[in-house]
Amino acid sequence: MADSAGATEPIHIMGAGLSGLAAATILAKAGKDVHVHDVRADSGARFDGDFQALENWSMDADFFQQLEQWGFDASQFRATEFQVVDLIHPDDVITQPKSDRIAYRIVERGTAEHTIDQGMKR
């Protein structure tokens, strides 16, 4: 919001997870004054080295290419690419659909330097 003199108030984002960090980065690149707040001391602190799959099959664009377009450096964090997905059906049958491109990536979450949380924070 702008006051009567045209100055804008800072934008406060609650949560330093991936969505909060992405929103803050995009707003800051647009010239906004952004403050990110989180209940924990650091981005990714709730995960402590957990792994997360980031799916990549539901859109035509590659998610890491989108990150690059948004101004993130995907080389800042480790990711392992997979083209096969193991699907376990209710009857315990396992199928393995394959993709010609990257179906998903496993990333590490947390406070270590190589995690996606810290890469996006930088």
Predicted segments, located by residue:
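N-terminal FAD cofactor-binding segment of flavoenzymes
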Residues: 26, 30, 43-90
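Carbohydrate-recognition beta-sandwich/jelly-roll modules
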Residues: 18, 42-43
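N-terminal Rossmann-like FAD-binding beta1-loop-alpha1 element of flavoenzymes
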Residues: 2-36
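Conserved N-terminal helical subregion
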Residues: 81, 86-122
